């Protein structure tokens, strides 16, 4: 791609050419992330419907196909759903704040997409390789709740407002638990750079992955990620049987679809971060032939798919928790466990070098 830089310099001059080339390069890299992500979101909805249908002994979507090919039945369903959503009218309720009503979906989707700027798919395949990547992701994922709160308030509906308040309290509660769980990863890797975190898990086998010594933190992080994305069994922000549809009860058409995209993009982000920080990222489970011949991106995508399967499995299996049960789990279970684990991990890391070299501590320190 850098071979096009002289062409830009010839067309626009030395100074402008370099600036325009860098701008075009970054825009192409952004599109190279966003377009596959949106396709992944679309087909994650298809996978969800097929997997849950299988668990409930149903068929699932099997009609919409490409070019009439029978064995592709159902694979065109996400495209059909997207076209239908685009063609639907966006109805703004009477008494709603029109500007904020339309701004809320944008505020929800923007952080969900912006967080991917620092996510590495391999040592070379990353848009922005910054040293504070983990801090940046925590900041971006925290901003998504503003779109939900504004949507609930701008709708001028008590059901939407209740859903927004539930979502805000839930995100604040589980954001703390997620942050404390990631502090343990930071302590073990001594870095906020996601590439360095993966490099710290190298060692020849899955026994060096942070999931082994930090297994309780892995569970806390993943369950908190499910709660933060408002997925079952933590979907009290929507709560169809309680508050109709929560914060997006009055949304329709593309505005509703953007909320939908943000939720599924956040699901993929949580699964990706769990794979990078606890499951070795793009590292193979065993560094021997034939495992190390498979590209690292394939290993990362496989781990992400496994994590996403658990998201879908939870939806088909568990009933919705009550709101008070969700708050109790976050504040009285997860946060105390993470704080205790941080203290224990810090104490272990202060042991003498001889103790750290004994089995099994020598696997992890």
Swiss-Prot record:
Subcellular location: Cell inner membrane
Keyword check for ATP-binding: no
Keyword annotations from UniProtKB, A to Z: Cell inner membrane, Cell membrane, Membrane, NAD, Quinone, Translocase, Transmembrane, Transmembrane helix, Ubiquinone
Name of a matching Pfam family: NADHdh
Gene Ontology process terms (BP): aerobic respiration
The protein's enzyme class: translocase
TM stretches of this protein: 27-47, 99-119, 133-153, 168-188, 206-226, 268-288, 294-314, 329-349
Catalytic reaction list: a quinone + NADH + 5 H(+)(in) = a quinol + NAD(+) + 4 H(+)(out)
EC number of the protein: 7.1.1.-
Gene Ontology annotations for the cellular component aspect, listed alphabetically: plasma membrane
Cited InterPro entries: NADH_UbQ_OxRdtase_su1/FPO, NADH_UbQ_OxRdtase_su1_CS
Topology within the bilayer: Multi-pass membrane protein
Keyword Protein biosynthesis assigned: no
Record text on subunit structure and interactions: NDH-1 is composed of 14 different subunits. Subunits NuoA, H, J, K, L, M, N constitute the membrane sector of the complex.
Entry protein name: NADH-quinone oxidoreductase subunit H
Family to which this protein belongs: Belongs to the complex I subunit 1 family.
GO molecular function: NADH dehydrogenase activity; oxidoreductase activity, acting on NAD(P)H, quinone or similar compound as acceptor; quinone binding
Its biological purpose: NDH-1 shuttles electrons from NADH, via FMN and iron-sulfur (Fe-S) centers, to quinones in the respiratory chain. The immediate electron acceptor for the enzyme in this species is believed to be ubiquinone. Couples the redox reaction to proton translocation (for every two electrons transferred, four hydrogen ions are translocated across the cytoplasmic membrane), and thus conserves the redox energy in a proton gradient. This subunit may bind ubiquinone.
């Amino acid at each position: 791609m850098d071979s096009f830089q002289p062409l830009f310099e010839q067309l626009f001059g030395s100074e402008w050419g370099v600036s325009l080339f860098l701008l075009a390069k970054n825009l192409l890299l952004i599109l190279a992330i966003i377009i596959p992500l949106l396709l992944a979101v679309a087909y994650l909805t298809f996978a969800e419907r097929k997997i849950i249908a299988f668990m409930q002994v149903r068929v699932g979507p099997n009609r919409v196909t490409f070019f009439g090919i029978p064995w592709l039945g159902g694979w065109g369903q996400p495209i059909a759903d997207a076209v239908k959503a685009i063609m639907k009218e966006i109805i703004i309720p009477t008494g709603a704040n029109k500007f904020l009503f339309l701004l809320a979906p944008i505020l929800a989707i923007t952080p969900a997409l912006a967080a991917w700027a620092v996510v590495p798919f391999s040592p070379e395949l990353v848009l922005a390789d910054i040293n504070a990547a983990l801090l940046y992701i925590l900041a971006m994922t925290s901003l998504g709740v503003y779109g939900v709160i504004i949507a609930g308030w701008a709708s001028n509906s008590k059901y939407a407002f209740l859903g927004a308040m539930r979502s805000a309290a839930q995100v604040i509660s589980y954001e703390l638990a997620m942050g404390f769980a990631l502090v343990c990863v930071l302590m073990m890797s001594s870095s906020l750079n996601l590439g360095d975190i993966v490099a710290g898990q190298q060692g020849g086998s899955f026994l060096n992955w942070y999931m082994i010594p930090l297994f309780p933190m892995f569970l806390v992080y993943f369950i908190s990620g499910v709660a933060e994305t408002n997925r079952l069994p933590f979907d009290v922000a929507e709560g169809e049987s309680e508050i109709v549809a929560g914060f997006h009860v009055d949304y329709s058409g593309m505005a509703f679809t953007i909320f939908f995209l943000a939720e599924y993009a956040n699901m993929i982000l949580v699964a990706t971060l769990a794979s990078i920080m606890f499951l070795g990222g793009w590292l193979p489970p065993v560094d021997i032939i034939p495992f190390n011949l498979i590209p690292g991106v394939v290993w990362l995508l496989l781990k992400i798919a496994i994590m996403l399967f658990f998201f879908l499995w939870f939806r088909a299996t568990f009933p919705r928790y009550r709101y008070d049960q969700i708050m109790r789990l976050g504040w009285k279970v997860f946060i105390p466990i993470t704080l205790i684990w941080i203290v224990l991990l810090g104490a272990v890391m202060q042991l003498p070098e001889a103790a750290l070299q004994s089995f099994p501590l020598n696997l992890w320190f």
